[in-house]
Amino acid sequence: MSDNLNMTAPGAGTGYSGDIFDRLLRERIIFLGSQVDDEIANKLCAQILLLSAEDPTRDISLYINSPGGSVTAGMAIYDTMKYSPCDIATYGMGLAASMGQFLLSGGTPGKRYALPHARIMMHQPSAGVGGTAADIAIQAEQFAQTKREMAKLIAEHTGQTFEQVTKDSDRDRWFTAEQAKEYGLVDHVITLAEGPISN
């Protein structure tokens, strides 16, 4: 994705000023198309903040095709989504796993979509631990707190109980688009007959 977040008018005769993601950004469409890490999180947060400042009344569309990644980086994106005055419509396509699933279900209620062949996977967060025994104990407590916090938020977004989410995310839990809708991870499954997706 381009580091250039310039929102200038398209170049004459081209329809856009270069990078396809810049053109999509002008249409208020942003992509999470990779593993979630700090660099990607910073870019997505900046794009959400930019679009929110530009017009706080229009929706932002976030397309997700991600295997997941860093919990802290994902939480930065999630908190920015919630901080934005704009509705954030989320679209799961390809794979929305782990933190990808979390962000998909964290979209604005009623505006969370899955494409028909998307696969969604929910599981508990994972983390490597190391260091002294005291460090490991501290990290384990932080990990347990993060696990509880994420299960609580997923329960709020899906309408499932905290206990059910905790049980279901104990191991990898895979969903088709329709199963994700039934569970409450998304609100709609987009069919090809509905035509193009736009704001």
UniProtKB/Swiss-Prot annotation:
InterPro entries: ClpP, ClpP/crotonase-like_dom_sf, ClpP/TepA, ClpP_His_AS. Keywords: Cytoplasm, Hydrolase, Protease, Serine protease. It is found in: Cytoplasm. Its EC number is 3.4.21.92. Pfam families: CLP_protease. Signal peptide: none annotated. Gene3D superfamilies: 2-enoyl-CoA Hydratase, Chain A, domain 1 (3.90.226.10). Its main location: cytoplasm. The active site is at 98 (nucleophile), 123. It catalyses: Hydrolysis of proteins to small peptides in the presence of ATP and magnesium. alpha-casein is the usual test substrate. In the absence of ATP, only oligopeptides shorter than five residues are hydrolyzed (such as succinyl-Leu-Tyr-|-NHMec, and Leu-Tyr-Leu-|-Tyr-Trp, in which cleavage of the -Tyr-|-Leu- and -Tyr-|-Trp bonds also occurs). One of its GO terms (cellular component) is cytoplasm. One of its GO terms (molecular function) is serine-type endopeptidase activity. GO terms for biological process: protein quality control for misfolded or incompletely synthesized proteins. It comes from the Bacteria. Cleaves peptides in various proteins in a process that requires ATP hydrolysis. Has a chymotrypsin-like activity. Plays a major role in the degradation of misfolded proteins. NCBIfam families: PRK00277.1, PRK12553.1. Fourteen ClpP subunits assemble into 2 heptameric rings which stack back to back to give a disk-like structure with a central cavity, resembling the structure of eukaryotic proteasomes. Belongs to the peptidase S14 family. This is ATP-dependent Clp protease proteolytic subunit 2. It comes from Corynebacterium efficiens (strain DSM 44549 / YS-314 / AJ 12310 / JCM 11189 / NBRC 100395). The gene is clpP2.
